[in-house]
């Protein structure tokens, strides 16, 4: 499994990494986001949405579980599964995971059994007040190629 690591010093750098990642997004991509409360998962998602050209305000779907944004070059399905009652709760996630948009799933470890085998796992950890350590782990060929492409760009701190 290929890994990429970055250290960002402010939310704008976190968004820049997300925006670049979005530039290579394809329909059916699934990105999982892990990190403590306030680590920057929603900040990452905001940058990703900007990269897709989404103009609507992006915020955490904590109480709705899934927010759909359809005004970009690809639909974005932002999921926060932290409040799901149990892993077997049927929200039709397969339709999202194998659909025409990109899924960003916060707290994805809570629905591990429902996730596609291939995905990009993103872990965001606090490294100071505004500093973050961001780790991408590619699971599957599609995401190995995505990480390879991202590693070629030096316009973000790596």
From Swiss-Prot:
Pfam families per UniProt: TsaE
Q: Which InterPro entries match?
A: P-loop_NTPase (IPR027417), T6A_TsaE (IPR003442)
One annotated Gene Ontology cellular component of this protein: cytoplasm
Q: Would I find ATP-binding among this entry's keywords?
A: yes
Q: Which domain of life is it from?
A: Bacteria
The entry summarizes the disruption phenotype as follows: Cells lacking this gene exhibit significantly reduced growth in rich and minimal medium.
Listed result of changing residue 41 to A: Severely reduces ATPase activity and growth rate
Which residues take part in binding ATP? 38-43, 130
Q: Gene3D superfamilies from the xrefs?
A: P-loop containing nucleotide triphosphate hydrolases
A GO biological process of this protein is: tRNA threonylcarbamoyladenosine modification
Per its record, what are the GO molecular function terms? ATP binding; metal ion binding
Predominant place of localization: cytoplasm
Q: What positions does the entry give for Mg(2+) binding? A: 42, 106
Q: Which UniProt keywords apply?
A: ATP-binding, Cytoplasm, Magnesium, Metal-binding, Nucleotide-binding, tRNA processing
Stated role: Required for the formation of a threonylcarbamoyl group on adenosine at position 37 (t(6)A37) in tRNAs that read codons beginning with adenine. Is involved in the transfer of the threonylcarbamoyl moiety of threonylcarbamoyl-AMP (TC-AMP) to the N6 group of A37, together with TsaD and TsaB; this reaction does not require ATP in vitro. TsaE seems to play an indirect role in the t(6)A biosynthesis pathway, possibly in regulating the core enzymatic function of TsaD. Displays ATPase activity in vitro, which is modulated by the oligomeric status of the protein.
- Similarity comment: family membership: Belongs to the TsaE family.
Q: How does it assemble?
A: Monomer, homodimer or homotetramer; in equilibrium. Low salt concentration favors oligomerization, while high salt concentration favors the monomeric form.
Among PANTHER family, the record links this protein to: TRNA THREONYLCARBAMOYLADENOSINE BIOSYNTHESIS PROTEIN TSAE
- What's the protein called, per UniProt? tRNA threonylcarbamoyladenosine biosynthesis protein TsaE
Tell me which species this is from.
Bacillus subtilis (strain 168)
